[in-house]
Amino acid sequence: MSKKSGLSFLWLSAVAFVVDLLTKYIVVQKFDLYESVNVLPVFNLTYVRNYGAAFSFLADHSGWQQYFFILLALAISGMLVYFLAKNNAEQKIQNSAYALIIGGALANMVDRAYNGFVVDFFDFYWDIYHYPVFNIADIAICIGAGLLALDAFKSEKKKVQDKQVEKCGQK
């Protein structure tokens, strides 16, 4: 009997993908560019266009970066799907991380390929200092990266514990 692979976590990619594109669609339909609605004293919904990557990285270049980011999203997503296929479904943290990164990367890629930019709208600030505006796909990618770090930490801790148990058994 073969064990279930990590591919069963791709539903999480689909959820991140659909929720991101749906929220971007709503923002584009309901907001004018740069329109901002105050939600909390430290949070606005603000429609902006990001022509670069995270934190508008490479946004001021001549347009080649759009193709670079599309290829990068496809390459990373392909690699992570391969990792999911190789993983056992019981590796829940790592599989969830990969799936969230895939969903976020592909959603931003579709937005970039269709529009030539990525729609961002979550705007957190304090006084006059604004954090870079971001979207659901960015959140999915960041949560995925955080889960990978957590998984690596847990795996390293388990290795240390296993070595300690092994040493105790040799005495």
UniProtKB/Swiss-Prot annotation:
Tree of life domain: Bacteria
Gene Ontology biological process terms in this record: proteolysis
Top EC category: hydrolase
Pathway listed: Protein modification; lipoprotein biosynthesis (signal peptide cleavage)
Disulfide cross-links: none
Catalytic activity as recorded in UniProt: Release of signal peptides from bacterial membrane prolipoproteins. Hydrolyzes -Xaa-Yaa-Zaa-|-(S,diacylglyceryl)Cys-, in which Xaa is hydrophobic (preferably Leu), and Yaa (Ala or Ser) and Zaa (Gly or Ala) have small, neutral side chains
GO molecular function: aspartic-type endopeptidase activity
Entry EC number(s): 3.4.23.36
UniProt keyword annotation of Transferase present: no
Function per UniProt: This protein specifically catalyzes the removal of signal peptides from prolipoproteins.
Family according to the record: Belongs to the peptidase A8 family.
Name of the protein in question: Lipoprotein signal peptidase
Protein's organism: Haemophilus influenzae (strain PittGG)
